[in-house]
């Protein structure tokens, strides 16, 4: 034993660095998770192992999982976390191959022979990107095949979406959207969505035979090897378009979006409104009635907060003189209680500072749209 062996840091590993995730197709692509605290605790540190490496690999088509934990030494302490057992508890039981890589390869190679999402799932849309064809499917979790696939991929939600949890697969209101390469059948990403009953008032409840629903995007993930290639926007648009065409859905929402998804959503929603001619409408009429705006919001199936943001962005895009007034009015109402208790001059300054932050953020989004198109 060397002197270093008595230092705690010798036996302490970053869980984010120790866990090596791979998606294996023609080539293996390895990457690190963003988060491991759901598995290894809030500190994301693992104590008791030297030179720890945790391999978590998936076949790029079937996502058959494989785990292999390696280390050069382990402390003989009963309190040391069993890192392999801990990881396996988050993976589908009796479906993971542990340590036997040859067996894993044989298993997914055999499974690939009959693996075909198009035989089981409902096709939503398809698109071309960089000379390749991609298909979007959807499924409920009632189907055994869909449940097996979701159990294999759901750990990616924990590793790449902050504060994510496993969904209740026994709830029939969940639907999963799947994105795959049409030729290779490689899975590119997936989205969990949920439908809530939407109460529209007593009159509507009495008259409508068919129930109406809010549709929610919950977990949205493009796997790391396929990110920053345009798939996120294509998948998002496919889902939104399918909901716009679904007469039972009255409103589209997103659950706790992070900043990156907010940007993706804003860019795509703005471009959709511009294609529908709202850009021209706001250019001609900067002072639109509340009735027109509410009617537009409902036809676009947008929640109020998102619709108001898009209206403000369109006003800024068209250099409308009403942009500043509209934003400040919204900010004042939102922060009324705090501003009402503040010195008038300081309140005006705070309102102006908030307005500048909103304006700068909108400009950033608009510039990213112009850059992607130009």
Curated annotation (Swiss-Prot):
Where located? Cytoplasm; Nucleus
* Recorded catalytic activity of this chain's protein: L-lysyl-[protein] + acetyl-CoA = N(6)-acetyl-L-lysyl-[protein] + CoA + H(+)
**Gene3D superfamilies xrefs:** 1.10.10.390, 3.40.630.30, Histone acetyl transferase 1 (HAT1), N-terminal domain (3.90.360.10)
Residue ranges of the region described as Interaction with histone H4 N-terminus: 42-44, 194-196
Tell me the segments the record calls region Interaction with HAT2: 197-205
The record's EC number reads 2.3.1.48
Any idea which GO molecular function terms this record carries? chromatin binding; histone acetyltransferase activity; histone binding; histone H4 acetyltransferase activity
Limits of the N-acetyltransferase domain: 135-303
InterPro entries according to UniProt: Acyl_CoA_acyltransferase, GNAT_dom, Hat1_N, Hat1_N_sf, Hist_AcTrfase_B-typ_cat-su, Hist_AcTrfase_HAT1_C
The cellular component terms of Gene Ontology attached to this UniProt record, alphabetical and capped at eight, are: chromosome, telomeric region; cytoplasm; histone acetyltransferase complex; nucleus
| Residues found modified as Phosphoserine | 354
**Keywords of this entry:** Acyltransferase, Chromatin regulator, Cytoplasm, DNA damage, DNA repair, Nucleus, Phosphoprotein, Transferase
Q: Which GO terms describe its biological process?
A: double-strand break repair; subtelomeric heterochromatin formation
| Keyword Acyltransferase assigned | yes
Which of this chain's residues are annotated to bind acetyl-CoA?
Answer: 220-222, 227-233, 258, 267
Q: Where is the active site?
A: 255
Q: Site annotation (Interaction with histone H4 N-terminus): which residues?
A: 174
Q: How does it assemble?
A: Component of the HAT-B complex composed of at least HAT1 and HAT2. In the cytoplasm, this complex binds to the histone H4 tail. In the nucleus, the HAT-B complex has an additional component, the histone H3/H4 chaperone HIF1.
Stated role: Catalytic component of the histone acetylase B (HAT-B) complex. Acetylates 'Lys-12' of free histone H4 in the cytoplasm. The complex is also found in the nucleus, however it is not certain that it modifies histone H4 when packaged in chromatin. Histone H4 'Lys-12' acetylation is required for telomeric silencing. Has intrinsic substrate specificity that modifies lysine in recognition sequence GXGKXG. Involved in DNA double-strand break repair.
Q: Which family does it belong to?
A: Belongs to the HAT1 family.
Q: What is this protein called?
A: Histone acetyltransferase type B catalytic subunit
Which species is listed as the source? Answer: Saccharomyces cerevisiae (strain ATCC 204508 / S288c)
Gene symbol here is HAT1
């Amino acid at each position: 034993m060397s002197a270093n062996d008595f230092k705690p840091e010798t036996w302490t590993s970053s869980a984010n660095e120790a866990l090596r995730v791979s998606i294996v197709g023609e080539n293996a692509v390895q990457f690190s998770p963003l988060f491991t605290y759901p598995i290894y605790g809030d500190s994301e540190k693992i104590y008791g192992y030297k030179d720890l490496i945790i391999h978590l690999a998936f076949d790029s088509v079937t996502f058959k999982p494989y785990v292999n934990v390696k280390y050069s030494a382990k402390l003989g302490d009963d309190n040391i976390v069993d890192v392999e057992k801990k990881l396996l508890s988050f993976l589908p039981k009796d479906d993971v191959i542990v340590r036997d890589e040859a067996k894993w390869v044989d298993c997914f190679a055999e499974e690939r022979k009959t693996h075909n999402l198009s035989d089981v799932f409902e096709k939503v849309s398809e698109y071309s990107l960089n000379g390749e064809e991609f298909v979007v499917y959807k499924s409920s979790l009632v189907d055994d095949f869909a449940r097996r696939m979701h159990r294999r991929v759901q750990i990616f939600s924990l590793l790449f979406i902050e504060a994510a949890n496993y969904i209740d697969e026994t709830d029939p209101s969940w639907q999963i959207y799947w994105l795959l390469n049409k030729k290779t059948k490689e899975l590119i990403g997936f989205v969990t969505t949920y439908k809530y009953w939407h109460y529209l008032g007593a009159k509507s409840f009495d008259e409508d035979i068919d129930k109406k629903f809010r549709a929610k995007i919950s977990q949205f993930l493009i796997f790391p090897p396929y990110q920053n290639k345009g798939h996120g926007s294509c998948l998002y648009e496919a889902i939104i378009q399918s909901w716009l065409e679904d007469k039972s859905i009255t409103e589209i929402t997103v659950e706790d979006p992070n900043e990156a998804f907010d940007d993706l959503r804003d860019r795509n929603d703005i471009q959709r409104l511009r294609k529908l001619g709202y850009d021209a409408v706001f250019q001609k009429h900067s002072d639109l009635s509340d009735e027109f705006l509410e009617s537009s919001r409902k036809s676009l199936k947008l929640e109020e907060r998102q619709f108001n943001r898009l209206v403000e962005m369109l006003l800024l895009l068209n250099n409308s003189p009403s942009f500043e007034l509209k934003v400040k009015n919204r900010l004042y109402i939102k922060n009324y209680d705090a501003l009402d208790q503040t010195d008038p001059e300081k309140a005006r300054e705070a309102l102006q500072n908030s307005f500048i932050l909103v304006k700068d953020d909108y400009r950033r989004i608009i510039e990213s749209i112009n850059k992607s198109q130009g």
